[in-house]
Amino acid sequence: MLKFTEEHEWLNIEGDVATVGITAHAAGQLGDLVFVELPEVGASFSKGDDAATVESVKAASEVYCPLDGEITEINEAITADPELVNSDPMGAGWFFKLKLKNVADADGLLDESGYKELIG
C-alpha cells in the first residue's frame, strides 16, 4: 500500500513494516543532495518527529517520521551516495524501514491522487 504525507514523504507499507523515503517532488525541490543522516536502527519515533536529515547544494531539511514506529533497517547506500535519492527517490533512494505501531494510522495519510493534488 503506497501512501504519502503532506511533508513529502512516501511510505510503501507491507504488513506492519513501511519503507519510507522522500518523493520525487521533494528531491527536485531540494536539488542535488550532498549529505544524508539516517536514524539509528532500533530507535523509536512518533509521527512528526525528525527522523533523518538531508543536505543539498540549496538547503538542509528534515525528513519526518510519517507514523509511530521503530526503525528496523536503514539504507546505508544513500549515506555513501546521496545522489541515489535524486536519481531514484522511490526505489534505491529509500531512507529507512519502520515497524508500525498501528498500521491503521496509515488511513489518515494521502493516497497517490491526493498527493498529486497537493503538489499541483
From Swiss-Prot:
Highest taxon, organism lineage: Bacteria
Lipoyl-binding domain sequence ranges: 17-99
One GO-annotated biological process of the protein: glycine decarboxylation via glycine cleavage system
Co-factor remark: Binds 1 lipoyl cofactor covalently.
Alphabetic keyword roster: Lipoyl
InterPro entries from the UniProt entry: 2-oxoA_DH_lipoyl-BS, Biotin_lipoyl, GCV_H, GCV_H/Fam206, GCV_H_sub, Single_hybrid_motif
Modification N6-lipoyllysine, positions: K58
Cofactor(s) listed: (R)-lipoate
Keyword Cytoplasm (UniProt): no
Short name of any one Pfam family annotated for the protein: GCV_H
GO (cellular component) term, any one: glycine cleavage complex
Functional summary from the UniProt entry: The glycine cleavage system catalyzes the degradation of glycine. The H protein shuttles the methylamine group of glycine from the P protein to the T protein.
NCBIfam families named among the record's database cross-references: gcvH, PRK01202.1
Family per similarity comment: Belongs to the GcvH family.
Subunit field text: The glycine cleavage system is composed of four proteins: P, T, L and H.
Name under which the protein is recorded: Glycine cleavage system H protein
Lineage: Bacteria, Pseudomonadati, Pseudomonadota, Alphaproteobacteria, Hyphomicrobiales
Encoding gene per record: gcvH
